[in-house]
Amino acid sequence: MMRLPFAIKADQRGAALIELALAAPFFAALVIGMVDMSRAYSMKLKLEQSAQRAIEKVQASATKPTDFTYVGTEATTAATAAGYSGSTATVDYWLECNGTKTAETTGAPLSPSNCSDGETYARYVSVTVSNTYTPLFASRAWPGANAQGQIPISGYAGVRVQ
């Protein structure tokens, strides 16, 4: 009768299965986390490519445009084509005098006369495309997540236009 507990204690069969059962949830959480991070990073890259596409339109224009609203439309169209409908694009256009940002607008022409005589001036256009990423397991515990568990993601591109 006393031999049965010793026999069970010495038996090693099934130990690996129990260890796997203890470790499997950890490994599953690790894989799900990696998949979530890679999907979020992929979304960021596609939004950035959408912003780059809009900047390419600015670079391709032969004239100096004074209205850049078409850039935002191009960026949202490119983001929708990439599979991210509901994206918003913000277009910034500003003038720098001697490397200092002096004025910002959403498309009105900025005259170099805003700079003092002898100052170097430059005009810039930038596009930011934004959307929200919903993880596989949405939670407010994720860094930067909103109340719905979604994480805001954006892509940025800019160019000097003069």
Which sequence ranges carry the predicted segments?
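Short, intrinsically disordered, low-complexity terminal/loop segments
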Residues: 1-2, 123, 160-162
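Generic N-terminal initiation segments characterized by hydrophobic and/or small/turn-forming residues
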Residues: 1-3, 17, 92, 107, ...
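Alpha-helical assembly-interface signal, strongest on the long, hydrophobic N-terminal helix that forms
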Residues: 2-79
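A generic fold-level signal
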Residues: 12, 121-122, 152
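Transmembrane beta-barrel outer-membrane domains
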Residues: 21, 120-122, 148
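Short amphipathic secondary-structure patches
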Residues: 49, 54-128
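Low-complexity, S/T/G/P-rich flexible repeat/linker segments used as non-globular hinges
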Residues: 130-162
